[in-house]
């Protein structure tokens, strides 16, 4: 019997992938990594830096009107918040109404945003304290928080009237947009505020960020919105879970609140004012939805119908603070 050596079996030759495929694979992997970094890091961080560093926009910095422009005497004032921010403002003493209204403006604006409606109410006898919110106008530098830390500015204004000026006037907090949010949050914490006028307030931190992200940038809440909220809270050092305006309205209790919305405002539509109104407990709370030219612009209820706006505010204040 003869045996033969097994024949050598040749292993199949593996073909090397073309070089262009290897390069393409690396490019795709690199692009995926860059997209992940953009979505989870660069875009949210950049937006958070923009929000928390917000100040008065250039077109508002050029404004020079003061109460004196409208023939109303005033004095320049300064006071400090509980977290050490210097706040600059104007004070117009009350005449026969024995009520001083604290005016809080919106993001990127200044005390001049509310000047004309303040003058209208001053002519009816109400006092006015208009101020620049932290990091805006002439006030001191601080990280912006869309209303949560800004509540300390409102509280400081009320404290200035009570403790430094020893005013016996009733104090009303009147804000627009971010300023309305700050006014409601402040009123929930201090009994010195007798009533609130809230024009175009936010609903909560989460809702505000998510809503604006979709409305203006058409970006998804996940992952960008979640990361953006994290970075805003980290930079401005606050807890977004405590930034709940609905809860603040409930805590204000039976103190009167007037909620205002421009009829076709897409940023803070009337439905939000309605939700806040429904959350209130005061039998003296009111809801005003203003129609007229420009009622599709955020916070432009006054501009849409100034006569109706001021008449309703005066009526509310006389009823709320007899």
Language model: regions and residue ranges:
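An N-terminal hydrophobic leader/cap segment in hydrolases
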Residues: 33-80
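The serine-hydrolase catalytic nucleophile loop
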Residues: 107-120, 133
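Alpha/beta-hydrolase active-site loop
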Residues: 113, 144-165
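Conserved alpha/beta-hydrolase
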Residues: 120-140
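Hydrolase active-site cap/lid region
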Residues: 185-238
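Short beta-strand/loop motif that positions the catalytic acidic residue
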Residues: 252-253, 258-261, 265
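Conserved alpha/beta-hydrolase "acid-adjacent" motif
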Residues: 266-272
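C-terminal catalytic histidine-bearing segment of alpha/beta-hydrolase fold enzymes
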Residues: 274-322
